[in-house]
Curated annotation (Swiss-Prot):
NCBIfam families named in the record: L18_bact
Presence of the UniProt keyword Ribonucleoprotein in the record: yes
UniProt subunit comment: Part of the 50S ribosomal subunit; part of the 5S rRNA/L5/L18/L25 subcomplex. Contacts the 5S and 23S rRNAs.
Protein name: Large ribosomal subunit protein uL18
Organism listed in the record: Streptomyces avermitilis (strain ATCC 31267 / DSM 46492 / JCM 5070 / NBRC 14893 / NCIMB 12804 / NRRL 8165 / MA-4680)
Record keywords, A-Z: Ribonucleoprotein, Ribosomal protein, RNA-binding, rRNA-binding
Gene this protein is translated from: rplR
InterPro entries per UniProt: Ribosomal_uL18_bac-type, Ribosomal_uL18_bac/euk
Record function comment: This is one of the proteins that bind and probably mediate the attachment of the 5S RNA into the large ribosomal subunit, where it forms part of the central protuberance.
Gene Ontology molecular-function annotations: 5S rRNA binding; structural constituent of ribosome
Stored Pfam families: Ribosomal_L18p
Lineage, opening ranks: Bacteria, Bacillati, Actinomycetota, Actinomycetes, Kitasatosporales
Keyword Nucleotide-binding: no
Swiss-Prot/TrEMBL GO biological process terms: translation
Family named by the database record: Belongs to the universal ribosomal protein uL18 family.
GO (cellular component) term, any one: cytosolic large ribosomal subunit
Length: 127
């Protein structure tokens, strides 16, 4: 394999494909101080969004379904993703970030990923 990810069967194959796509995406996407990278990490149960300055290697803002403000709220995972998107946008704007580069993390831009991105846009982040 060109990207060094071992191919397996079942769920391991799906995770390897996501990892392979994320490596390919990261070749073209990088966050700077002016436009940091909004990276979304998704599991079966939770979703995490981080605003990262890749030049310095610092996380400027983050939000997750594990945050106490979101945890125990909506039971629908798409609604939780919307809450995470709005919260990460609010925290990013508090850190002085207005525009970001969106990194979907190798996942399809649909469902929870799209819900998070739409909520972040509605909250004022530009991408």
């Amino acid at each position: 394999m060109a990207y060094g990810v071992k191919i397996a069967k079942g769920d391991a194959y799906k995770r390897a494909a996501i990892k392979r796509r994320h490596i390919r995406i990261r070749k073209h996407i990088s966050g700077t101080a002016e436009r940091p990278r909004l990276v979304v990490t998704r599991s079966n149960r939770h979703i995490v969004a981080q605003v990262i300055d890749d030049v310095k290697g610092h996380t400027l803002a983050s939000a997750s379904t594990l945050d106490t403000t979101i945890r125990g709220g909506e039971s629908d995972k798409s609604a939780q993703a919307k809450s995470v998107g709005a919260l990460v946008a609010e925290r990013a704007k508090a850190a002085g970030v207005e525009a970001v580069v969106f990194d979907r993390g190798g996942n399809q831009y649909a469902g929870r990923i799209a819900a998070l991105a739409d909520a972040a846009r509605e909250a004022g982040l530009k991408f």
